[in-house]
């Protein structure tokens, strides 16, 4: 994908019958790039847009893309920062969706971030997260009798997301609830941080009594949005360690233009499988 984006390729001088003092094979320099960055417009991002450009400049990265979760807002700021820091910028986004009852993510590159469709993507994401947060609290009350003030937790919550871990922390900070048997059984055997994590996993994790199943837009709808916004759709490597080759091939057939291969979050074995698919399908 780097060669395609930058238009670079390796060049070797032909081995003619000409005598040189030394081997003069040359190759064009390929600039470092990072096309999967999250800013603080994502719930898992820490840095604002300018901080990311400053860090990229310091690291010698020449091309970046900020692909926030279900949000295209960073791109407008990033375009201004691009000129200021002399770093090439490719507008991007990463959108959650569903395919065959499994959650996948679509990376959109070269998008027109001003397209109104992305406002809808973000709005629906915030509504979805708020509904899920309230449902977690409702199930907790039903299962344990413990009540969490969700209005307070959501009041200044930028992403309208209150996780099971955050709810567990509120419960463990309440002196009355700490005396409940369901909380005591976690406190008596472990230190507090481990107790909170295990409580959250047991109650809100997959199969737990307070677990909330999330539903996302259909993959086909998200691919259409990216293409209508003049972008290219790339399958994110997120969770690909758990996707079989047949499933990935089926995904690609729905209309992807490319696939993310290299990521520190996936195994070498997965990268090898994905490279094979990308070459076979002639993907970016």
Report each predicted region and the residues it spans.
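Conserved acidic, metal-coordinating active-site core of Asp-based
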Residues: 161-231
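Alpha-helix capping at helix-to-loop junctions
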Residues: 114, 142-146, 177
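An N-terminally biased module of ancient metal coordination in phosphate/nucleic-acid-related enzymes
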Residues: 1-102, 203-282
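Conserved phosphoryl-transfer catalytic core
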Residues: 127-164
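Active-site phosphate-binding/coordination module
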Residues: 77, 94-130
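An N-terminal domain-start capping segment
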Residues: 1-8, 137-152, 192-200
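Secondary-structure boundary/capping signal
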Residues: 86-89, 148, 179
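Alpha-helical scaffold segments that flank or form the walls of functional sites
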Residues: 50-64, 80, 116-122, 126-141
């Amino acid at each position: 994908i780097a060669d395609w984006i930058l238009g670079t390729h390796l060049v070797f001088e032909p081995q003619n019958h000409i005598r040189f003092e030394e081997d003069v094979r040359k190759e064009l320099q390929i600039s470092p790039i990072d096309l999967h960055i999250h800013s603080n417009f994502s719930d898992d991002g820490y840095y604002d847009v300018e901080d990311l450009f400053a860090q990229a400049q310091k690291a010698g990265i020449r091309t970046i893309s900020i692909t926030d979760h279900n949000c295209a807002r960073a791109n407008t700021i990033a375009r201004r920062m691009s000129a200021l820091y002399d770093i090439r910028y490719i507008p991007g986004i990463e959108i959650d969706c569903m395919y065959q009852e499994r959650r996948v993510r679509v990376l959109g590159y070269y998008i027109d971030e001003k397209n109104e469709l992305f406002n809808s993507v973000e709005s629906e994401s915030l509504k979805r997260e708020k509904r899920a947060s309230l449902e977690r609290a409702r199930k907790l009350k039903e299962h344990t009798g413990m009540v969490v003030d969700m209005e307070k937790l959501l009041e200044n919550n930028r992403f309208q997301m209150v996780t099971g871990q955050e709810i567990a922390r509120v419960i463990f900070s309440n002196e009355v609830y700490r005396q409940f048997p369901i909380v005591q059984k976690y406190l008596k055997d472990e230190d507090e941080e481990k107790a909170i994590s295990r409580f959250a996993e047991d109650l809100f994790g997959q199969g737990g009594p307070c677990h909330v199943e999330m539903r996302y837009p259909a993959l086909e709808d998200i691919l259409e949005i990216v293409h209508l916004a003049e972008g290219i759709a790339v399958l994110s490597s997120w969770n690909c360690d758990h996707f079989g080759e047949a499933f990935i091939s089926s995904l690609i057939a729905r209309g992807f233009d490319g696939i993310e291969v290299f990521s520190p979050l996936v195994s070498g074995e997965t990268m090898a499988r994905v490279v094979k698919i990308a070459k076979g399908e002639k993907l970016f």
